[in-house]
């Protein structure tokens, strides 16, 4: 089957914004004007097409990135048909991992801002993520019909708060109740949308007389931004020659793609004004898959490889989201970077070295789905029924394996116990947690052997809050949550030799006898974590009992003598012992080994290790003193700070146990304007006072 839309006419874009900037309504209007949905969905009615989880409709917020395919040929049908894959991303700070996931598979983004609220804290976080992945973007200032709307104030905030080189492409005609439409600064015409047909048609009119002067000034600003794209245009512009519409648009496009400028449009999605012209800007200024650099990866032989956006290259795709669908089970959302795949084809998951068969492939339109037979470079689609794929895995041609930019998921560092409130919740909870763990590789579930409690572990407090919240809303499971627990570790600092362990019961009947002598020594933290060396000579312990000694020690490692935490970075040398022809058994040697291990561990200067987090705080300069003071109180080691005009980045290493409640404290110190990220860095010895308190608490 031939390609329907040439790849140059693809636009893979994200709609990204602070909560309540009207992002979902904007996405809805895109679907309406591109002809996908015939009744406009309103968030106010809980009927929006893009928000498809039940609780999203309840709360009017977006949690999962739904990917939708739409088509657009321009407001005046001036373009050939373009295919726009829209990824609606959450704007809530708690769902930043979702935003980050989708930023990886986008080519361009539309940043939606509220004309009243402007650039809010979460906008700054999303902006930094877009910078990280070098995503070209345009801005849409929404809610121009609201009281207090001020377009130019938001343009100014884009410059001062985000450091963006913001260049208006339009100016609003009127604002608040009098918002009529926009002036196209390239054409120098006012666009008025027809309210009778919900903005499906429009007219170009003359610019209102009282706006002419401002429009001239802003147009000069726009043309100058275009002229700066090349020396040739600059000479023409400085020589007083008029630049043509094509020259201006081509030059602006080049600068947007190079991430040098942000073009700003405006409107009111709710009032059906402006989204249409913003869609034209998506087509004219945002990149197609061929405008962005080839994606890099690692070939089978560990050399660096790459895949260009072409149907002729071998198939390579990145799975960026796993979602559970009530009707079909697992949906794996993936972005095709190169090649073609048909339903029925077998591909290889190069990260897990497993083959997968593409059964059914669907193109998602919010929560409706259309079955398709093939997908090609540039497409975003979902596969049903892939067995063993998680977020960040690469799916590729078995004859040309490549691993695209691997996503590493660190081990969880924080755990809480969850217990179902009722017997009915008990069964549902196991199922719910299993599903959620499958969707999110940074979340784990296990049962505590001693207490029988279900323990969930994740990357931080917020992470676990969301999981519990989703359990309640999606799976209707009510659960009680314990206090957060830090995952400590135990190890030793000095070597001890010739420590004996003897297990002997020989009073009548068949007895038990095992006897071992071991050395215990610390290992390098970068090493294997545990090693067992057998140096028994002359058969003083028969060979069949040696594995039992190893096993006896390994069982002790799960729960250390200090405070019952896992033991790491130790080596054991077994070099002497004795046995009894009749009474010795594997069990007896296992018990002897555990006795020897405990005795040796307690003599070897045991210490408690605590998880240290790498913390990066980004804050406006005026709060730096407060932020650093607070970090110091949390036993932080501040490694340095980098500043630009708008934000100071503070890097620190902080014990995880001191970071509980940090999100709330940081918010109150900085009026919500700072953000932070935290990831596990290493384990380090806990100070004596901290270790003593932890050990004491475990005894209770």
UniProtKB/Swiss-Prot annotation:
Native species: Mannheimia succiniciproducens (strain KCTC 0769BP / MBEL55E)
Example GO molecular function: guanosine tetraphosphate binding
Annotated localization: Cytoplasm
Keyword tags: Cytoplasm, Elongation factor, GTP-binding, Nucleotide-binding, Protein biosynthesis
Single biological process term from Gene Ontology: ribosome disassembly
Physiological role: Catalyzes the GTP-dependent ribosomal translocation step during translation elongation. During this step, the ribosome changes from the pre-translocational (PRE) to the post-translocational (POST) state as the newly formed A-site-bound peptidyl-tRNA and P-site-bound deacylated tRNA move to the P and E sites, respectively. Catalyzes the coordinated movement of the two tRNA molecules, the mRNA and conformational changes in the ribosome.
CDD domains: EF-G, EFG_III, EFG_mtEFG1_IV, EFG_mtEFG_C, EFG_mtEFG_II
SUPFAM superfamilies from the UniProt entry: EF-G C-terminal domain-like, P-loop containing nucleoside triphosphate hydrolases, Ribosomal protein S5 domain 2-like, Translation proteins
UniProt protein name: Elongation factor G
Record-stated family: Belongs to the TRAFAC class translation factor GTPase superfamily. Classic translation factor GTPase family. EF-G/EF-2 subfamily.
InterPro entries named in the record: EFG_II, EFG_III, EFG_III/V, EFG_IV, EFG_V, EFG_V-like, EFTu-like_2, G_TR_CS
Binding residue positions for GTP: 17-24, 88-92, 142-145
Pfam families: EFG_C, EFG_III, EFG_IV, GTP_EFTU, GTP_EFTU_D2
A single Gene Ontology CC term: cytoplasm
Domain tr-type G, first and last residues per copy: 8-290
SMART domains given in the database record: EFG_C (SM00838), EFG_IV (SM00889)
Organism superkingdom: Bacteria
């Amino acid at each position: 089957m031939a390609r329907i839309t040439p790849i140059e006419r693809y636009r893979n874009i994200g709609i990204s914004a602070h909560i309540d900037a009207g992002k979902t309504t904007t996405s809805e209007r895109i679907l309406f004007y591109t002809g996908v949905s015939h009744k406009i969905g309103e968030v106010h009615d809980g009927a929006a097409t893009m928000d498809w989880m039940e609780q999203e409709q309840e709360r009017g917020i977006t949690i999962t990135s739904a990917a939708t395919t739409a088509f657009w040929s321009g407001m005046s049908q001036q373009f050939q048909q373009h295919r726009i894959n829209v990824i609606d991303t959450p704007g809530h700070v708690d769902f930043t991992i979702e935003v980050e996931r989708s930023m990886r598979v986008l080519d361009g983004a539309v940043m939606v801002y509220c004309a009243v609220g402007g650039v809010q804290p979460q906008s700054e976080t999303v902006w930094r993520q877009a910078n990280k992945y070098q995503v070209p973007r345009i801005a849409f200032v929404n809610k121009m019909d609201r009281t207090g709307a001020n377009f130019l104030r938001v343009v100014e905030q884009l410059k001062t708060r985000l450091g963006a080189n913001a260049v208006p492409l339009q100016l609003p005609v009127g604002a608040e109740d009098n918002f009529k439409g926009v002036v196209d600064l390239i054409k120098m015409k006012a666009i008025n949308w027809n309210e009778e047909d919900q903005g499906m048609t429009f007219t170009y009119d003359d610019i209102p007389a009282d706006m002419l002067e401002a429009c001239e000034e802003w147009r000069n600003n726009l043309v100058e931004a275009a002229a700066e794209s090349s020396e040739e245009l600059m000479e023409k512009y400085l020589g007083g020659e008029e630049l043509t519409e094509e020259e201006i648009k081509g030059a602006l496009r080049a600068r947007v793609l190079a991430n040098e400028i942000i073009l700003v449009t405006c409107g009111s999605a709710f009032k059906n004004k402006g989204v249409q012209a913003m869609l034209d800007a998506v087509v004219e200024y945002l990149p197609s898959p061929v405008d962005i650099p080839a994606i890099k990866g690692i070939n089978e032989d560990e050399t660096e490889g790459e895949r260009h956006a072409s149907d002729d290259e071998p198939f390579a795709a990145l799975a960026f989201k796993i979602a559970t669908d009530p009707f079909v089970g697992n949906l794996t959302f993936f972005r095709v970077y190169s090649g073609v795949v048909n339903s029925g084809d077998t591909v290889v998951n190069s990260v897990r070295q497993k083959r997968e068969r593409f059964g059914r492939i669907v193109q998602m339109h919010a929560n409706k789905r259309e079955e398709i037979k093939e997908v090609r470079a540039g497409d975003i689609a979902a596969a049903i029924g892939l067995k063993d794929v998680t977020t960040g895995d690469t799916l590729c041609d078995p004859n040309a394996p490549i691993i695209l930019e691997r996503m590493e998921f660190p081990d969880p560092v924080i755990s809480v116990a969850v217990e179902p409130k009722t017997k009915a919740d008990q069964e549902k909870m196991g199922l719910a947690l299993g599903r959620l763990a499958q969707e999110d590789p940074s979340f784990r579930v296990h049962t505590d052997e001693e207490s029988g409690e279900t323990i969930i572990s994740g990357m931080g407090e917020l992470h676990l809050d969301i999981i519990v919240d989703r359990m309640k809303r999606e799976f209707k499971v009510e659960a009680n949550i314990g206090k957060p627990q830090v995952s400590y570790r135990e190890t030793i600092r000095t070597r001890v030799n010739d420590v004996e362990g003897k297990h002997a019961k020989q009073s009548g009947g068949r007895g038990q006898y095992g006897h071992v002598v071991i050395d215990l020594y610390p290992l390098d933290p970068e090493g294997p974590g545990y090693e067992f060396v057998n140096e028994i000579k002359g058969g003083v312990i028969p060979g069949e009992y040696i594995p039992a000694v190893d096993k006896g020690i390994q069982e002790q490692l799960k729960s250390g003598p200090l405070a019952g935490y896992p033991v790491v970075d130790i080596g054991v040398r077994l070099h002497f012992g004795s046995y009894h022809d009749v009474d010795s058994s594997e069990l007896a040697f296992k018990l002897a080994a555990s006795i020897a291990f405990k005795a040796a561990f307690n003599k070897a200067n045991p210490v408690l290790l605590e998880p240290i987090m790498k913390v990066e705080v980004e804050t406006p300069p005026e709060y730096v003193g407060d932020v650093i003071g607070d970090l110091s109180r949390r036993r932080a080691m501040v490694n340095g700070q980098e500043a630009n005009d708008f934000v100071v980045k503070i890097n620190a290493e902080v014990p995880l146990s001191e970071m509980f409640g940090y999100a709330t404290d940081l918010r109150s110190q900085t009026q919500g304007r700072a953000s932070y990220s935290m990831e596990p860095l290493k384990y380090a010895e806990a100070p004596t006072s901290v270790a003593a308190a932890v050990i004491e608490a475990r005894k209770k």
